[in-house]
Amino acid sequence: MILLALPNKGRISKPVNEILEKAGLKISVHGRSLFAQTVDPEIKVMFARAKDIPEFVRDGVADVGVTGYDLMLERDTEEELEMLLDFKFGNARLVIAAPENSTVNSIEDVKDGMKIATEFPGLTKRYLEKKGLNLEIIELSGATEIAPFIGVSDLICDLTSTGTTLQLNRLKEVENVVSSTTRLVANKKSMDDPEKSAKINQVLSGIKSVLYAQSKRLIMMNAPKDKVSEITSIIPGMGGPTVSEILSNDKMLAINAVIDENKVFETVTNLERLGARDILVVPIERIL
């Protein structure tokens, strides 16, 4: 049996749960319970704060978990966890920012003794030390953007996705500390256990199959027999398109193929030009 730690709230919680459900790992949640069972009796779920998950997995409380790369660095657990997968979403950057009217425009303008407010004291301290800077770090638990305007700090170190929040709060970016995405991580001892690692790899495989399918589409059509060669040349598919007879029409063939989502518009245009008809483009839930 393995225990999977998932964020109990926040912007990555919903998409992660949706991916697991598409992978076939439906979670049975009862009220506000901190634990839940999945359709697989050998996989149990624990809901926790995303910031605590790196330590829970490192310490073996959970065998595998989903968290942000920034949170792994904050808890200084990066080297102690087995990195299994980058979900490629939940993108954010941890940046140092200053008020728009500040004389600090780059990291070179930051001076020893300045105050910096952050929800990431560990990561901020290590980064500043690497830059040879000694600042007073003020740990806050939210609303970091207000700190410079109420005399709490000179600078902030906070997460941003688009930079819009910084601009709305009259702040300017001074330095990019680290870029972060959502990660799947595992306990190293659990990965050394044959039974647990096998189950963890099942979870990993399921997630990968969903993520891979997100960028693909199944395209189906009926096409003239004399155009099949041209049509199959523009939809190579995965291992080649599937071509089959249409019982009610001996002049047409049915063709199915998997194509990249970003090529759908161009492909459909070319297929219509070649005489394909009854074209269907369908999302795919999983590709294994």
Swiss-Prot record:
Signal peptide: none annotated. NCBIfam families: hisG, HisG_C-term. This is ATP phosphoribosyltransferase. Its EC number is 2.4.2.17. Belongs to the ATP phosphoribosyltransferase family. Long subfamily. It comes from Methanococcus maripaludis (strain C5 / ATCC BAA-1333). The gene is hisG. Catalyzes the condensation of ATP and 5-phosphoribose 1-diphosphate to form N'-(5'-phosphoribosyl)-ATP (PR-ATP). Has a crucial role in the pathway because the rate of histidine biosynthesis seems to be controlled primarily by regulation of HisG enzymatic activity. Its main location: cytoplasm. Transmembrane segments: none annotated.
